[in-house]
């Protein structure tokens, strides 16, 4: 929907774009109501959502002709994560899990190649550890926005198509995690696309090299930035199904015992 707003602006449909932006805000406010939070928490979060909503509406104002460039695209795209991270952290807190939203743009430093920005890993690690490690050491779960970074001067960037996996790998690398779990809509990595081939078989175990070779052969396995980070830190990567969490999925690591299901 947010990317659709950018397209509407390109077409000069500013009023429709503004209506869509308001619909995004209303949707998140409705989700907030559904969470049934304690009054003080509800009111605080409602104010945060409305504040972000005003920022979103400012990007699609009717009285000024908006220049629709890659930088605006990234700013618009970022609002979904920034809103949902707050709601998810609140839901966790209400369920008894200490959690806070964290803006990845506060520590993921990137170049200014908007829509396909590359992270500056060393500086990202330093900044990320300063923010994330104290939270983790205090038993607080950081709910970090995905696929978003920022330039040195604070302009919002995104790291390209399907870069949420990459964001997760960066965060795992920053905190020196032993495991990274990628939640998707399939049961793991297959020998072929299971939607296209009845002969596709689920792979239970893969090495980094095997997963990389499969990706280079054209398989839509993981974002290409995930495996280099995982192999550098000997991190185990799991690919599992969000809708069937009881299944083991595929394990990618330094070594494996092999196996097609």
Predicted regions: what they are:
Residues 251-261:
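A conserved regulatory-domain signal marking ACT and ACT-like small-molecule sensing domains
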């Amino acid at each position: 929907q947010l990317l659709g707003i950018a397209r509407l602006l390109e077409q000069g449909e500013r009023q429709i774009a503004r209506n869509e932006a308001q619909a995004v805000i209303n949707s998140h406010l409705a989700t907030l109501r559904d969470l049934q939070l304690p009054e003080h928490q509800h009111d605080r979060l409602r104010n945060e959502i409305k504040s972000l909503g005003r920022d979103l509406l400012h990007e699609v104002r009717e009285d000024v002709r908006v220049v629709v460039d890659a930088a605006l695209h990234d700013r618009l795209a970022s609002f979904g994560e920034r809103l949902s991270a707050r709601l998810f952290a609140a839901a966790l807190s209400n369920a008894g899990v200490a959690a806070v939203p964290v803006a990845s743009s506060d520590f993921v430093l990137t170049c200014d190649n908007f829509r396909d920005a590359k992270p500056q890993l060393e500086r990202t690690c330093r900044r990320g550890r300063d923010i994330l490690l104290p939270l983790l050491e205090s038993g607080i779960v950081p709910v970090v926005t995905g696929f978003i970074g920022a330039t040195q001067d604070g302009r919002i960037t995104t790291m390209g198509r399907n870069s949420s996996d990459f964001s997760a790998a960066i965060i795992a690398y920053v905190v020196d995690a032993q495991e990274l779990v990628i939640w998707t809509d399939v049961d793991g990595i297959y020998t072929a696309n299971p939607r296209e081939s009845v002969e596709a078989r689920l792979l239970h175990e893969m090495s980094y090299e095997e997963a990389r070779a499969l990706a280079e052969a054209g398989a839509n396995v993981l974002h290409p930035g995930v495996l280099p980070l995982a192999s550098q830190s000997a991190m185990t990567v799991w690919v599992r199904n969000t809708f069937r969490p009881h299944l083991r999925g595929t394990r990618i690591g330094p070594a494996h015992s092999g196996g097609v299901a």
